[in-house]
Design a protein with these regions (language model features):
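Hydrophobic transmembrane alpha-helices and their membrane-interface caps
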Residues: 10-63, 120
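Pore- and gate-forming transmembrane helices of large, multi-pass membrane proteins
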Residues: 14, 71-106, 116, 122, ...
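Short helix-capping/hinge motifs at transmembrane helix termini and TM-loop junctions
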Residues: 4-6, 32-34, 106-108, 141-142
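Hydrophobic alpha-helical transmembrane segments of membrane transport and translocation systems
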Residues: 106-161
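Hydrophobic alpha-helical membrane-associated segments
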Residues: 3-4, 20, 50, 54, ...
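Transmembrane alpha-helix detector for multi-pass membrane proteins
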Residues: 41-61, 83, 87, 91-98, ...
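Short helix-terminus and kink motifs of transmembrane alpha helices
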Residues: 6-13, 38, 57-60, 64, ...
Length: 161
């Protein structure tokens, strides 16, 4: 979806962020020898969806700013985009984490694995959507030309400021 909706380089960043989230979440379960059951699997799948949604929000802002801020470097555009989405991402993640802490404390023993997986996954997913996906774009040398709309033949294009 991201390769078609945005650009191939964005999809590489998103997949890298998703792999990062899943590996760290499963690593925590392995490190602390926590039982892995179907509820944990459901939580890992939810983490993938949550992280992908965050990554899409950040990627959309990066794409939008590449088209708006034409004279800046890729690093500057990505920095502005991350700054603009940081408050939204942190508030969303913190409210989710508060609910997950309550779920862990009051949810009972059967739901602990689910809550732990989501706690770790949301925390790591927030980090990866901001830092991992954007840095992969920089490593792949994202440029303004990658995101410019194609010019249709015979159509006059207005100059943007």
């Amino acid at each position: 979806y991201i390769a078609f909706r945005f650009q191939f380089k964005f999809s590489v960043g998103a997949v890298s962020a998703l792999a990062h989230d899943v590996i760290i979440t499963l690593g925590v379960f392995s490190l602390f020898e926590i039982d892995f059951d179907l509820t944990v699997l459901a939580a890992v799948l939810a983490v993938i969806g949550y992280s992908l949604n965050d990554t899409i929000v950040v990627s959309d802002r990066i794409r939008e700013n590449f088209r708006k801020i034409r004279k800046e470097s890729a690093v500057a555009v990505i920095n502005v985009s991350l700054t603009e989405t940081l408050a939204r991402t942190l508030v969303t993640s913190l409210t989710t984490l508060l609910v997950l802490v309550a779920l862990f404390i009051f949810g009972g023993e059967l739901i602990h694995g689910f809550a732990i997986a989501l706690l770790v996954g949301v925390f790591v997913g927030t980090y990866s959507s901001i830092y991992v996906a954007a840095n992969v774009l920089l490593l792949m040398n994202i440029a303004k030309e990658d995101l410019m709309l194609p010019v249709k033949e015979g159509v006059e294009v207005d100059e943007l400021p």
